[in-house]
Amino acid sequence: MQKASLTILGCGSAMPTRKNFPSSQLLEIRDKQFLIDCGEGTQIRMCQMGVKANRLGHIFISHLHGDHCFGLMGLISTFGMLNRTAELHIHAQADLEKILKPQLQYFCNDLSFNVIFHTINTRKHELIYEDRSVQVFSIPLKHRVPCCGFLFEEKQRDRHIIREMIDFYGIPTFRIPRIKQGEDFITDEGEVIPNGILTTPSETPKRFAYCSDTAYYEKIIPIIEGVDCLYHEATFMEDEKIRSKQTEHSTARQAGEIALKAGVKKLIIGHYSARYTNQTDLLNEAKAVFENTVLGEDLTTYEI
Amino acid sequence: MQKASLTILGCGSAMPTRKNFPSSQLLEIRDKQFLIDCGEGTQIRMCQMGVKANRLGHIFISHLHGDHCFGLMGLISTFGMLNRTAELHIHAQADLEKILKPQLQYFCNDLSFNVIFHTINTRKHELIYEDRSVQVFSIPLKHRVPCCGFLFEEKQRDRHIIREMIDFYGIPTFRIPRIKQGEDFITDEGEVIPNGILTTPSETPKRFAYCSDTAYYEKIIPIIEGVDCLYHEATFMEDEKIRSKQTEHSTARQAGEIALKAGVKKLIIGHYSARYTNQTDLLNEAKAVFENTVLGEDLTTYEI
């Protein structure tokens, strides 16, 4: 089976540090790439990791704070210089198009590909993207500006056919696709061979949720329930709880609480305030509530 | 004496590489900081080098290609978060204000400081900035879009007074500033003590020229003649001479030729095309013409 993986390009917050670039991550599912947020330096991080973005067609922007979108112009320009031809789709609030279009006209007026904007309603939990193998849903978040997270759901794959059974029952090739989808096989003699004898189930589809930036917000719990991996912001620790409320960010402990209540399998924290030079403290605070927490780090790939 | 120094934050060209960020450098003269170009990631490089930009008041943008200005929004946002209060002056072509203003309004509408735009006429060689210790002149360059380099000239400092002479002639304190500026001293008895006896000359003022991006362009030679340090772009090697002409860039050899003809003291090359993984080849090509050439490198400080 192909694995789903998440590569963190940047998991700092508003101010970059020596370790962390602003928010950006690359999700790879079934040979497709999805970019989630695009802070300054995203294309530089990709270059540092040797990421070829030739399977990247869709970018999802959570909200219009600079640390989540200032890398778009550089990335698009570079795609132009690489003579990209495939359409590039950007999913974001409507304002982004208004801000980027004049810049695209000025700096990239001879682009070799189209940039297509799709408007997200950040207040609604709804399907915003779908292809044959993946669905993406918006997750309304609670932040100072309109903001939403993203739930990526792999679709159920076809069942695995048991090769010996094809031979045993002499199943013709043209029948196989439907059997993989769960159909029984009827022999020439009219005998019904139940699908369960011919196939084994496919892997459980992967689910990944990205929740940044947000205050502690329990309304997301039913949406992200049981995901294989949750990336949740942990800008502050409990020592800065007042500031986290004011700025509508979460503490590491709160990220752990959300993970626990939603029964997720793994939590990755990130979007750390630049004030924390020792991020292990943030990890420990989240782990005290939710054991299977991982410290998000730039230039690192996580299996989902 | 305080030294003048140049810190290269990025000396890559349009496409970043593992080694090089896009164009940006910080010039420090007499305790002031000047930023020259501001490609994507400039603030990240500053952070990586521990540069505090609290003496930075003026930014000079050579031209409006993304790799020379996409870092401005991130830098300005961060200055805002740091509660900067000092005015920030940006010297660039008029179009930059039109492009940045809507972004500033959207992303930084509550900035704690003013951003002031100054228009450069890139076709003219003229004084574009002056304070008590430094003058900056534009240097018209030859590129696909309006573009100019910058000549930074330190002003002549006061002469050094010889302390023993103050005591010997009993020179009152209030006379000292004018003697430092070259005046003779007249004793109470009417004796004229020539300035040359009382003082020694100050250091020769430093001159630095930044020339990027540009085709080989001999018209800059009289302007940059004899500078202590010339940063000249060397996007290509002679093997890509046709491409360098098409794109109006220089080869390393041409950078060396300009340095030689202008009789500069030191040449730093940069703005390397991403195709050259071994930049020593570029250095050697320039050195074959102009021996005192230095390879520009990101995150490196050069004395001027």
Give residue spans per PLM region.
Chain A
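Active-site metal-binding motif and surrounding structural segment of the metallo-beta-lactamase
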Residues: G41-H91, T119-N121
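Active-site neighborhood of divalent metal-dependent phosphoester bond hydrolases
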Residues: R84-L88, Q93-N121
